[in-house]
C-alpha cells in the first residue's frame, strides 16, 4: 500500500472484543496477529478495535473491553500508535441467545452515545465510528439519522469539544462519577457524567450554568447538579 501511496494510512485488522468480557477470549486470535505485525516491524499507522459489549452491556462494559484491548497491546510490546474504534454501538444482539436485541432510545441513547466518545478520551482511543448512520434498522440498539437522540448527542459533543484542548478525565474513588476537563476559548470547562443511574456532582464556583445534550442550559443552584448523563458545566 505504501509503495502505491506513501501518504495512505494503513489501519490494522480490527478485532471484536465482546467475547472477551469475562475470559479475554479475543486474545486467542488477536495476540498472534500482533506477533505477526511485530515480525514485520509494525507496518501500520493505527490499531483498530470493535468495542461492542454484549447486548445487555452498558458503557461501563464497553470501557472494560477497551481497557482489555489496551492491555493486550502493552503485553505484546506494541509501539504507541493511534487506536481507532471502527465500529461501536450498544444493544446489538448476541453473543448467544441469552443476549437478545435491545432497543436503546430517548435520553439513554443520547447519553450512551456521548459517553462512548468521552470514555474514548479516557481510554486513549482517537477515533470512534458509531455504527451506523442510516434509516432505522432494528439490528442496532441506538439509531443514527438526522434528528435521532443519538445523532443529536453527536452534534452536541462536536459543539462542546471540537477545537478545545482535552486535559484529563478523573473518576471518584467508587468509579461512579466522571469529570472531564477541557480548555476552550472561554477558559476551563467540565463535562460530568455518572457511570450508572443519577448522581449529584458538586461544582466549582467558576461554573454558573449546566447544559444537557439537547441544548437546554439551566443555572446551577447551590453549586450542585444532579444528572443521569453528560452535562456541560460552564461560566
What is the meaning of each model-derived region?
Residues 218-235:
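C-terminal beta-strand-rich structural cap/linker in extracellular carbohydrate-active enzymes
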Residues 171-206, 213-215, 235:
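Carbohydrate-binding surface patches
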Residues 51, 209-211:
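Extended non-globular C-terminal regions
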Residues 87, 132, 192-194:
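Active-site proximal loops enriched in glycine and acidic residues that flank catalytic Cys/His/Asp
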Residues 89-161, 165-176:
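Aromatic/acidic polysaccharide-binding cleft in carbohydrate-active enzymes
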Residues 146, 212-218, 223:
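Detector for glycine-centered tight turns/loop "hinges" at secondary-structure junctions
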Residues 1-113, 123:
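Noncatalytic carbohydrate-binding groove/subsite architecture in carbohydrate-active enzymes
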Amino acid at each position: 500500500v505504501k509503495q502505491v501511496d506513501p501518504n495512505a494510512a494503513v489501519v490494522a485488522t480490527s478485532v471484536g472484543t465482546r467475547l472477551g468480557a469475562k475470559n479475554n477470549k479475543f486474545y486467542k486470535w488477536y495476540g498472534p496477529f500482533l506477533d505477526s505485525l511485530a515480525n514485520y516491524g509494525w507496518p501500520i499507522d493505527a490499531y483498530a478495535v470493535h468495542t461492542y459489549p454484549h447486548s445487555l452491556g452498558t458503557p461501563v462494559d464497553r470501557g472494560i473491553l477497551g481497557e482489555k484491548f489496551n492491555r493486550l497491546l502493552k503485553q505484546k510490546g506494541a509501539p504507541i500508535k493511534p487506536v481507532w474504534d471502527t465500529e461501536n454501538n450498544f444493544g446489538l444482539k448476541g453473543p448467544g441467545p441469552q443476549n437478545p436485541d435491545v432497543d436503546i432510545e430517548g435520553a439513554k441513547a443520547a447519553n450512551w452515545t456521548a459517553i462512548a466518545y468521552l470514555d474514548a478520551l479516557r481510554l486513549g482511543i482517537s477515533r470512534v465510528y458509531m455504527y451506523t448512520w442510516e434509516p432505522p434498522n432494528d439490528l442496532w440498539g441506538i439509531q443514527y439519522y438526522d434528528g435521532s437522540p443519538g445523532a443529536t448527542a453527536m452534534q452536541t459533543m462536536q459543539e462542546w469539544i471540537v477545537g478545545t484542548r482535552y486535559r484529563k478525565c478523573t473518576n471518584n474513588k467508587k468509579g461512579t462519577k466522571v469529570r472531564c476537563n477541557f480548555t476552550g476559548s472561554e477558559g476551563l470547562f467540565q463535562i460530568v457524567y455518572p457511570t450508572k443511574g443519577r448522581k449529584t456532582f458538586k461544582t466549582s464556583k467558576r461554573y454558573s450554568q449546566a447544559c444537557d445534550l439537547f441544548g437546554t442550559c439551566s443555572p446551577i443552584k447551590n453549586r450542585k447538579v444532579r444528572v443521569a448523563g453528560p452535562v456541560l458545566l460552564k461560566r
